[in-house]
Amino acid sequence: CYRPPVC
């Protein structure tokens, strides 16, 4: 995942 909750 990245910084924002987006996997």
From Swiss-Prot:
Question: Where, by tissue, is this protein expressed?
Answer: Expressed by the venom duct.
Secreted as a keyword? yes
Instruction: List, alphabetically, the GO terms of the cellular component aspect.
Output: extracellular region
What keywords is this UniProt entry annotated with?
A: Disulfide bond, Ion channel impairing toxin, Secreted, Toxin
| UniProt keyword Secreted, yes or no | yes
> What parts of the sequence cross the membrane?
none
Provide a Gene Ontology MF annotation, just one. toxin activity
Q: What is its main location?
A: secreted
- Positions of disulphide bridges: C1-C7
Where located? Secreted
- Origin, by domain of life? Eukaryota
Q: What does this protein do?
A: Its target is unknown, but this toxin may modulate voltage-activated calcium channels (Cav) or calcium-dependent potassium channels (KCa).
About its domains, the entry says: The cysteine framework is C-C.
Family statement: Belongs to the O2 superfamily. Contryphan family.
Tell me the protein's name: Contryphan Li834
